[in-house]
A protein has these predicted regions:
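Nucleotide and nucleotide-moiety/phosphate-recognizing core
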Residues: 2-98, 109-122, 130-134, 141, ...
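Short glycine/threonine-rich catalytic loop with a Thr-x-Gly-x-Asp
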Residues: 101
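Hydrophobic alpha-helical segments within soluble ligand-binding/sensing domains
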Residues: 104-107
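Gly/charged, well-structured mid-domain segments that form the phosphate/adenylate-handling core
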Residues: 126
């Protein structure tokens, strides 16, 4: 399986809401002592962990699909799981979904265009900004102080769920690990 965490490259974005996917990949890499794979044509940081590949596209969010399709095609991977931030869920929510629309998320839009909509998703709720016109600044901002105290546990729970996908069905993992909010 190819497990992708969406985010933006660079230290300026490292602790932002939009980079929650990267944070989960970092946790999975840490837990599994995954081996880095170097290949510039993948346009991302790629790791091998047992039977899985872990990817952080380094293309910026709106071009994530090019990195995903490069890895998917090179290794002939059928199953893809994408971890991403979701404005439509309250902070701390964790939901699992197969296929569906991109909901205005540019990383998902790019992924859909590259590999189709037929992939599994881990939706991580980041809440909504107060005003609709503030979406871009909201997703590119760090988490609030009161959210930061829950971040490690939330990321750990998402990583636990993803690890369980090796031995449990997607529906069973969804039932066991879905969180409405923290």
């Amino acid at each position: 399986m190819l497990i992708v965490g969406l985010g933006n490259p660079g230290s300026a974005y490292a602790s932002t809401r939009h980079n929650i996917g990267f944070m989960v990949i970092d946790e999975l890499v840490r837990r599994t002592s995954a081996t880095p794979i170097s290949k510039s044509s993948f346009e991302g940081e790629l790791f091998k962990s047992k039977d899985n590949y872990l990817l952080k596209p380094m293309t910026f969010m709106n071009l994530s699909g090019s990195s995903i399709i490069a890895v998917k095609n090179f290794y002939k991977i059928d199953k893809v799981l994408v971890i991403h931030d979701d404005l439509d869920l309250p902070f701390g929510a964790l939901r699992f979904k197969f296929a569906g629309g991109h909901g205005g998320h540019n990383g998902l839009k790019s992924t859909d265009e590259a590999i189709s909509k037929e992939y599994a998703r881990v939706r991580m709720g980041i809440g909504k900004p107060t005003h609709k016109g503030e979406v871009s600044s909201f997703v590119l901002a760090p988490f609030f102080e009161n959210e930061k105290q829950h971040l490690d546990k939330w990321i750990s729970t998402a990583a636990d769920a993803i690890e369980k996908l090796q031995t449990m069905s997607f529906d069973d993992v969804s039932s066991q690990y879905s969180i409405k909010q923290i």
